[in-house]
């Protein structure tokens, strides 16, 4: 099934604690789809609350309910202080700094937290679920600073900024800017909530920051991999490359990694109908015909194989895909997990544990960062392949259409692509950066939200690298005069570029061209072009 559809019907997303997907989170975040908390989930939450309250009334010690928090667990707190204890927790941990998450990112975080609480083991009252759902459905979006999470005990600081809005404090976004929550709630006639036993803790003690953001990053990264395949196919056609490296038997039978199979299938589909590509058998026959009798060694201008950057696409992009598939799987598990502490199960002892620890997501998002970094490397090397006259199979230096020397063509446009590859490589794994905190109570932490933010940064950088490649591939088509021989998919891709940016005839200001195409990539425009203009269903 294609990852991106031309049109998506806006139907409510069921938030039941069991079935939420990365794709559904994107719908809530990006398309502003509404959410529905099923009656069964409300009933589970109510049952969990009743179990909890029965325990609490017996004065049984419960972390964060009759005790202080974190390292201060040794402090016993009377249950008469329940509201004050929960409110103080939220206020004190609303200490995030730095830029605010974008509105779609904040919506993803809220959706992730709502689904975790809807699983029914966190002992919050149903009104908490209903209020978070109301926020998503009415477009009330908490203003959440990006910096402050250690990824264990979950994303405390970011989620505190969500919880603070429920009690009428902190800020929400209006037109992308923070305004006081109290003002917005008053305008809408919404009464702030009073947090009861455990509810402050349940709201903030979990992985929903890294998981919500990670869902957006991984979903978009899968689309970026597809768009990398699209431009690679166009570029291969422009330089009259071979389709043989993508034959099914070399992947489905010989080396059946799922991502490799999917990428090879996409490459075959994208170049189907091309009058420019060649096959290995044709090259072999031509080489045999060219060989002079009686010579043991002779030079030929016929290359049976092109460089790795034009041949190892299934192996490289396919491995990126496999990494993203793994991350998507881990995110789906985490989205549908109870990841606060403590947890309550009927007929069982209170579970005091550490499900808030973000290590699974931290590792997964670091893997994503590594994979996307290599995707950027591949794109930059493909750019170089058509800009370097010694490697470009007859194309002029830097794709200059006029007088080389007087004009520089794409020489300058290559620099940001190369610089961004280097920048991506400086972004090391955050999951190995544990720093003890909280009086050494939190002595091993995941830094998972940093991992997710790092992956987001590389994703954004790659859109700019790929933008240069799209521009260069279209320019190669123009200079070579090979448009008529392109496959239907390549023509659709070329025309999508040219709707944004004209051919580079003489040198001009290039930054705007790159940003226009990068923005189109971020919106999935080239996926839509393929879906609209061809019958190809990309994997």
From Swiss-Prot:
Catalysed reactions, as listed in the record: L-tyrosine = 3-amino-3-(4-hydroxyphenyl)propanoate; L-tyrosine = (E)-4-coumarate + NH4(+)
Crosslink position(s): 5-imidazolinone (Ala-Gly): 152-154
Entry annotation: catalytic residues: 63
Post-translational modification: Contains an active site 4-methylidene-imidazol-5-one (MIO), which is formed autocatalytically by cyclization and dehydration of residues Ala-Ser-Gly.
Enzyme Commission number: 5.4.3.6, 4.3.1.23
Transmembrane annotation, as ranges: none
Keywords tagged on the record: Antibiotic biosynthesis, Isomerase, Lyase
Binding site for substrate: 93, 205, 311
GO MF, one annotated term: L-tyrosine 2,3-aminomutase activity
Residues where 2,3-didehydroalanine (Ser) is found: 153
Effect of residue 71 to A: Despite a decrease in activity, it shows lyase activity over time and still produced some amount of beta-tyrosine
NCBIfam families: Tyr_2_3_mutase (TIGR03832)
Family affiliation: Belongs to the TAL/TAM family.
Protein name: MIO-dependent tyrosine 2,3-aminomutase
Species whose genome carries this gene: Streptomyces globisporus
Taxonomic lineage of the native organism: Bacteria, Bacillati, Actinomycetota, Actinomycetes, Kitasatosporales
């Amino acid at each position: 099934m294609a990852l991106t559809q031309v049109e998506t019907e806006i139907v409510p997303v069921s938030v039941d604690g069991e079935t939420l997907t990365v794709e559904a989170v994107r719908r809530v975040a990006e398309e502003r789809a509404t959410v529905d908390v099923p009656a069964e989930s409300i009933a589970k939450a109510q049952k969990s609350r009743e179990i909890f309250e029965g325990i609490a009334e017996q004065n049984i010690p419960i972390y964060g309910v009759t005790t202080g928090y974190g390292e201060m667990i040794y402090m016993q707190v009377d249950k008469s202080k329940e509201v004050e204890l929960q409110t103080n927790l939220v206020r004190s941990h609303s200490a995030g700094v730095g830029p605010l998450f974008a509105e779609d990112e904040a919506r993803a975080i809220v959706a992730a937290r709502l689904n975790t609480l809807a699983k029914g083991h966190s002992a919050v009252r149903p009104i908490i679920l209903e209020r978070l759902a109301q926020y998503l459905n009415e477009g009330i979006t908490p203003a959440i600073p990006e910096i402050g999470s250690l990824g264990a005990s979950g994303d405390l600081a970011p989620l505190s900024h969500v919880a603070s809005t429920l009690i009428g404090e902190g800020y929400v976004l209006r037109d992308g800017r923070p305004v006081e929550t109290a003002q917005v709630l008053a305008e809408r006639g919404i009464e702030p909530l009073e947090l009861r036993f455990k509810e402050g803790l349940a709201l903030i003690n979990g992985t929903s920051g890294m998981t919500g953001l990670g869902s957006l990053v991984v979903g978009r990264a899968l689309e970026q991999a597809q768009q990398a395949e699209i431009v690679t196919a166009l570029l291969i056609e422009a330089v009259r490359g071979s389709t043989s490296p993508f034959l099914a038997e070399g992947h489905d039978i010989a080396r059946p990694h799922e991502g490799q199979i999917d990428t090879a299938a996409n490459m075959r589909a994208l170049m189907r109908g091309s009058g420019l590509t060649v096959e290995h058998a044709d090259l072999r026959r031509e080489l045999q015909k060219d060989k002079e009798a009686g010579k043991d060694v002779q030079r030929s201008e016929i290359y049976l194989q092109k460089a790795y950057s034009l041949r190892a696409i299934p192996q490289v992009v396919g491995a990126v895909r496999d990494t993203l598939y793994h991350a998507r799987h881990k995110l789906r598990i985490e989205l549908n997990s109870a990841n606060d502490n403590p947890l309550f199960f009927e007929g069982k002892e209170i579970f005091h544990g550490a499900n808030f620890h973000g290590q699974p997501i931290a590792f997964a998002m670091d893997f994503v960062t590594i994979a996307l970094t290599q995707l950027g490397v591949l794109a930059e090397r493909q750019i170089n392949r058509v800009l370097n006259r010694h490697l470009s199979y007859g194309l002029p230096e830097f794709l200059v259409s006029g007088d080389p020397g007087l004009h520089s063509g794409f020489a300058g446009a290559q620099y940001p692509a190369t610089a961004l590859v280097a920048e991506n490589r400086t972004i090391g794994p955050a999951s190995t950066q544990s720093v003890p905190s909280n009086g050494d109570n939190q002595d091993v932490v995941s830094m998972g939200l940093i991992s997710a933010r790092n992956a987001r940064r590389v994703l954004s950088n790659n859109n700019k690298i790929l933008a240069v490649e799209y521009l260069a591939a279209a320019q190669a088509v123009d200079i070579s005069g090979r448009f008529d021989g392109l496959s239907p998919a390549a023509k659709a891709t070329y025309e999508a570029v040219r709707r944004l940016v004209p051919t580079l005839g003489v040198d001009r200001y290039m930054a705007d061209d790159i940003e226009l195409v990068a923005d189109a990539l971020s919106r999935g425009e080239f996926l839509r072009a393929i879906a609209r203009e061809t019958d190809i269903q990309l994997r």
